[in-house]
Amino acid sequence: MSDTLPLLLRAARGEAVERPPVWMMRQAGRYMKIYRDLRDKYPSFRERSENPDLSYEISMQPFNAFKPDGVILFSDILTPLPGMGIDFDIIESKGPQIGDPIRTMAQVDALHPLNPAESMPFVGEVLGRLRQSVGNEAAVLGFVGAPWTLAAYVVEGKSSKNYAVIKAMAFQEPALLHKLLDHFAESIAQYLRYQIDSGAQVVQMFDSWAGQLSPADYDTFAAPYQKKVVDLVKQTHPDTPFILYISGSAGVLERMATTGVDIISLDWTVDMAEALARLPEHIGVQGNVDPGLLFGTPEAIEARIDDCVRKARGRKHILNLGHGILPGTPEENGASFFRSGKSVMDRIGALA
């Protein structure tokens, strides 16, 4: 019977559920003391995310503490890069650093096709262990970065405020950028298939930096490659719910709905009711509480959750933040978010 399946999986498939499932982007991370203690012991981010024992332990920390309805693999969107021949590191307080930023056609031509089982066996191992550990108490989520966002990192060489280098490439050498984006789309689709085969029940694609594009450029450099990833994954795994997240997506919501995804993860800068009015009925939503609210009071967190769920009522909805939980968030407020999310129907009533 399907009601023995995890709540989040049932909701993501569009089944009627007793309450919206709840999880948090970046729910495993720096706001938790247990994570900071582990980070002090293992300071290398790549070790924490690529050692299967550490990645598994970190992925399980929020589940053990708060029992969210989703457990997401502890990893990074850049994790597949070395398997394509691109070296990177993540430096504490500085963020990602790309060893040799990609600026030429020769560099793109030299990239390897991704074989995830070969280059990232730790990912498959962790996903399998997570499925075994959480059973039907939570859905296991896999994730990837979208082609535009991966390209932004590897072309810029690091995080950027204005994306001048990749935008220069887009407007001066579009053929070069399109070839890179196409390579990433093929590779990311393979990576998602591997994650699903290894145990991921729901997947999310982060196009974090696509919100930096004008709608016309989104149509040219982001949406076609998002759609290619979705199409390739749906060819082999049509029943796996697919979520798309873009930070700063209010200007392209309708466009996101044309990519073939099942659920759009909203940031907090768009009102939930307005977003739903703009999206087709068959598209579900995830979000969209402001992570900054988690620096407030438990009462404020509860009130905002109630408002969000009330507005999303009647539509496929997964309760989440509008972005990852912020470092420095009081851990008890993270607990508050989960507690209030799970008890929301007690306050707003099943039919209110």
From Swiss-Prot:
This is Uroporphyrinogen decarboxylase. It comes from the Bacteria. It is found in: Cytoplasm. Belongs to the uroporphyrinogen decarboxylase family. Signal peptide: none annotated. Its main location: cytoplasm. InterPro entries: UROD/MetE-like_sf, Uroporphyrinogen_deCO2ase_HemE, Uroporphyrinogen_deCOase. Homodimer. It holds the Pfam family URO-D. One of its GO terms (biological process) is protoporphyrinogen IX biosynthetic process. Pathway: Porphyrin-containing compound metabolism; protoporphyrin-IX biosynthesis; coproporphyrinogen-III from 5-aminolevulinate: step 4/4. Keywords: Cytoplasm, Decarboxylase, Lyase, Porphyrin biosynthesis. GO terms for cellular component: cytoplasm. Its EC number is 4.1.1.37. Catalyzes the decarboxylation of four acetate groups of uroporphyrinogen-III to yield coproporphyrinogen-III. Substrate binds at residues 26-30, 76, 153, 208, 323. It is an enzyme of class 4 (lyase). The keyword Lyase applies. GO terms for molecular function: uroporphyrinogen decarboxylase activity. The record marks 76 as: Transition state stabilizer. It comes from Synechococcus sp. (strain WH7803). It catalyses: uroporphyrinogen III + 4 H(+) = coproporphyrinogen III + 4 CO2.
